[in-house]
Every structure is written in C-alpha cells, then in structure tokens.
C-alpha cells in the first residue's frame, strides 16, 4: 500500500472532514488502532493539523508509532502539533521473537526509537509488549520486562498473543501475566488496568 497518496490520501481527506465536524468537549485524543507513522509526512501533518484544534490545554494527546516508521522528523512534527504522549509498538526485545511475530523492526531499532523519543522531549512514553509467543519461556518473559524498565518509559502495556495461526499455551501465558503483575509494580509501575502498568501520574486517561 502506498501511504503517501492514492487511497491513503483519500482516507485522510475523509477523516479530516469527519474530525472537522466534531464539536466538544474532548477529554482525550488517541490516534492509533493502526500505524499512523506509516503515513508520509504531508498526510500525517494534515491529520494532526485537523485534530490539533480539538486539543485544549492539558488534554492528553496520544499517537501510536511503530519503531520502523518513527524518525526525528515525525517526532518534531508531533511536538509541533501538540502531541504529548507516544505509544510505541515495541512488542519484544528479542529479534527471533519479532521475526516470528511478523515484525520488521529489530530489538535495537525499538530501543533506539524509545531513546530518541525521550531525547526529543517526550516525557510520557508507553511501550507495548506481547507475551505468550510459541516457545517463549518464563525466563524469556522476565528478560523482556527487565529490559523494558531500563528504558525511559512511564507506561507499559502487556498483551497476551492472540492469533489462531500461532498456537499458544494458555497456562504458560497465565504464568507470564502473573509475572507481569508481580514484576512491574515492584519496579514502580502500578497495575491500574487489565493490560496496563504506569508510573505514578502517568496512567493513560484514554483507557
């Protein structure tokens, strides 16, 4: 798919039109449920410009991003357009697992994306992690959480893999979820919602 023109451009035009018809009040803005950063800069700018007018003072404004399509230029654009929270789809810090999940970024790219976002000025950073992949052990999962808390993140979302094409062990997944509920709070991330853990004051208002 060409995310710079054609159907993508028509979609953003239609979406911008719908956004333009929204009144208020708006309590949160969340652009995601896909990969907004896959869009070319002109379309991304159009989407953000159309949305920014809804972002009143103090409103949580989140954009989802994938490591492979997040760069300095897009981070600057986000800041210019009032985005104050990023949710980065890290998924894993192990290259073999990322490949098995069909992700095209590397573990290093994921960590670099988080660090760059922090350097650019994003103080409210979430990362998504997936547990329960085939052949994943409890030790593997613990190592993922250990790496996550070393990064400058304020929020961690942990999701169990759900894919009919990739069988998972429900008991193993349950143990990994229990591990998350023990490990992350012990390191300052409060378990405030089913899949979400946050440092004090950084709970996602949109959840």
State each model region's role.
Residues 186-188:
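A long amphipathic alpha-helix within ATP-dependent nucleotide-binding catalytic cores
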């Amino acid at each position: 798919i060409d995310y710079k023109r054609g159907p993508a451009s028509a979609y953003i035009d239609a979406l911008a039109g719908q956004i333009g018809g929204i009144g208020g009040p708006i309590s949160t803005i969340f652009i995601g449920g896909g990969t907004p950063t896959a869009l070319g800069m002109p379309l991304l700018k159009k989407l953000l410009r159309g949305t920014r007018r809804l972002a009143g003072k103090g409103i949580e404004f989140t954009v989802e991003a994938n490591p492979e399509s997040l760069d300095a230029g897009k981070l600057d654009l986000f800041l210019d357009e009032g985005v104050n929270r990023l949710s980065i789809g890290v998924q894993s810090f192990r290259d073999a697992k990322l490949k098995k999940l069909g992700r095209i970024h590397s573990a290093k790219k994921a960590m670099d994306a988080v660090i760059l976002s922090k350097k650019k000025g994003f103080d409210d950073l979430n990362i998504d992690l997936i547990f329960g992949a085939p052949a994943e052990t409890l030790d593997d999962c613990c190592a993922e959480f250990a790496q996550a808390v070393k990064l400058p993140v304020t929020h961690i979302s942990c999701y169990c893999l759900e894919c009919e094409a990739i069988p998972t062990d429900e008991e193993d997944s349950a143990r990994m979820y229990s591990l998350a509920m023990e490990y992350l709070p012990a390191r300052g991330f409060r378990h405030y919602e089913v899949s979400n853990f946050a440092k004090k004051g950084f709970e996602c208002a949109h959840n």
